[in-house]
Amino acid sequence: MSKIIGIDLGTTNSCVAIMDGGSVKIIENSEGDRTTPSIIAYPKDSEEVLVGQAAKRQAVTNPENTLYAIKRLIGRRFEEDAVQKDIDLVPYKIVKADNGDAWVKVKNKKMAAPEISAKVIGKMKKTAEDYLGEEVTEAVITVPAYFNDSQRQATKDAGKIAGLNVKRIINEPTAAALAYGVDKVKGDKTVVVYDLGGGTFDVSIIEMEDIDGEKHFEVLSTNGDTFLGGEDFDQRMIGYLVDEFKKDQGVDLTNDPMALQRLKEAAEKAKIELSSSEQTEVNLPYVTADASGPKHLNIKITRAKLESLVEDLLKRTIEPCKTALKDADLSTGDIDEVILVGGQTRMPKVTKMVQNFFDKEPKKDVNPDEAVAMGAAIQAGVLGGDVKDVLLLDVTPLSLGIETMGGVMTKLIEKNTTIPTNASQIFSTAADNQSAVTVHVLQGEREISSANKSLGQFNLEGINSAPKGQPQIEVTLDIDSDGILNVSAKDKNTGKKQSITIKASSGLSDEEVEKMVKDAEAHADEDQKFQKLVTSKNMADALIHSTKQTLDELKDEISIDEKSVIEASITDLEKVIKSDNKEAIDTKVKTLSEKAQLLAEKAQAKAGVKNTPQEEKNSDDVVDADFEEVKDDK
């Protein structure tokens, strides 16, 4: 049975881990890194798709086709405020899909966020397969605890498109708690996981208990903001640099995508440096040019300045902490330990602020970049039978219900209810002789239906004619272990039972997902062909170089005719190497190799002549020797 892998699909970076011999192993990617940038690029002059570090390296010269922070779009509608805000901040195009979702447009092709995220998941899958030496087909994938149903379903779709059966969706703070608690916590403890990542913020309060040798992890409450993270901190820094440059040089860099991409990289680097230094310098020569000539950016920035730029963002993380405590019916004094997760928590101001709020020094013995993937691997181990005596009880982050008369949301499942769970309630008709009812499913905390997230709606038809209020329609909401919702309805008066599938108001249809799965498989073949073509071209280049070098070294050893034949073969190969015809390249490589065999023979003969006198001299110097073994008496 193949391993179930654990994947942390992050906004900025992603990570993959497995259970290996009873412990968690973070798997290094092909570049030797333990985390992979969640960046996908489509080069202008190639059909190749770049993922990770390769995509990040070319971002400056290809900003409009380099996609990052796609997780912030997954499962979102184009009209949402968070999406509209992002449109002005990213160099690539965010467009409205036919179903109303937020998609991106790259090289004149519209693409769904799950389809793009699948490329990153695919890279994680390949990383695990290279390490294990076998195909991987199953995974546990993490999501922010505050992700709604649409975002969770979209993440599962991304896994499916990447060729994985997603066995479980697990909340990121819960995963981090697993990574921390399985080995490091003894006895019963109540911990807070404060997770400030690249694009999302979550806080969860988790009770860890040892019950008859079994570790129980029960989430008491969770809260957060799915559009708050390190990317927003970077944007504040970019905004400051743009303003300072405009004051100094009178040039607005926001109109220059290439300059903005350079600024983004520099801002991220400066932010990281300010976690360990009080001051840093952003130096970008030739950042842009105008009629007067090239312009250079050179700006010093202090840690205090960065803290002032992001002060309101930091404060935004405290309100969810207060709400989580209130929902769990706890105070800060009830918290035993605080765990920091997510790269942005390396900022000293974050640590200080969290410490002041909870009145406890946060634990630093968890790697904030790797803890979530480690927890996902532990959950994968539980599902695969590799990990025993661990029980995880998670919660739904938002309330679920349906719209009732007057545009009111009637909640059937309250937020922070332990999952899996289900709830049923009897509803009726609003008019006499009503033969059908529309069930509108909602997720959120507001009383007004329109202020909540619409998950979809369906019609229950064939209701018998009766006065209003008489028919009894039982609506059941069922949440599985992934936090994904299924809805059913039954007319109790007739006994007729109907299975209802919600026609989602957003998201990908089964047909679209299947098409994307097939596209991904087709591209996998294309990618493999491309890799083989590159290998052939590299071999051809190397052969041309070595043959030319040997020709020059042996110019006095070969005839003009021999030289002409070899040079003609080199020219033929140089011509065909410009094409994408692998078979033609391989044929010409074989021809040149055969022709160059003459050179190899002459080179060996020449080397033999040079070595003979030395070899003879060496043989004269050989004498027998007696060896005495010296024993060490130590």
Swiss-Prot record:
Secretion signal, residue range per the UniProt entry: none
Coiled-coil ranges (or none): none
Positions with biased composition (Acidic residues): 621-634
Phosphothreonine, modified sites: 200
Region (Disordered): 604-634
Superkingdom assignment: Bacteria
Expression induction or repression: By stress conditions e.g. heat shock.
SUPFAM superfamilies reported for this sequence: Actin-like ATPase domain, Heat shock protein 70kD (HSP70), peptide-binding domain
Keyword terms, alphabetized: ATP-binding, Chaperone, Nucleotide-binding, Phosphoprotein, Stress response
GO MF annotations in UniProt: ATP binding; ATP-dependent protein folding chaperone; unfolded protein binding
InterPro entries, per the entry: ATPase_NBD, Chaperone_DnaK, Heat_shock_70_CS, HSP70_C_sf, HSP70_peptide-bd_sf, Hsp_70_fam
Function: Acts as a chaperone.
Family named by the database record: Belongs to the heat shock protein 70 family.
PANTHER family: HEAT SHOCK PROTEIN 70KDA (PTHR19375)
Protein known as: Chaperone protein DnaK
Organism: Vesicomyosocius okutanii subsp. Calyptogena okutanii (strain HA)
Gene name of the record: dnaK
